[in-house]
Amino acid sequence: NIVYTDWQRDNYYRAVRKVVPDNSRRIALEGDHVTIEQRAKFCYYLSQTQFIDIAPATMRMRMIKSAEEIALIKIGAQVADLGGAACVAAIAEDVPEYDVALAATSAMTREIAKRLPHVELRDTWTWFQSGLNTDGAHHPVTTRRLKQGDILSLNCFPMIAGYYTALERTLFLGQPSDEQLRHWEI
């Protein structure tokens, strides 16, 4: 870890410079996590160093999972299913989107805490949109109240130990109209 103050611009890069040995010839960076500006600053403060982009290799390595990782991901999928069920149970006419999302997120958080009592509880969330709010993927949850015939977008994302799984479903409140069905069948 690097400790630095931010009282002067670029102190982070100065701190990195102090801990990188002078004879360092190469440093690996994940290029897709470094902005153009950040890369330029690394090159400026570590001008004798060559930077290698290891993002493709790192991504390939991350695709290989241990038995423990697979077990966490499977638990995440089960938790997402419970979140989806809680979401569906909360859906009713005149209920605001945020209440539906809160029900699903609370159910998932409680289930994670029950199954894994010593894990950090963070970054588990639900996106839930209704009606016109479903016109694009992953709009923020709003105070819009559900109406009969609404198309609904359910997205539950439990996060366990840095691994997230996703349950995404499209639903309707009541029966879809003939026009909605026609578009759905396209």
Where does each model-flagged region fall?
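Active-site neighborhoods and metal-handling regions in enzymes and metal-associated proteins
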Residues: 1-186
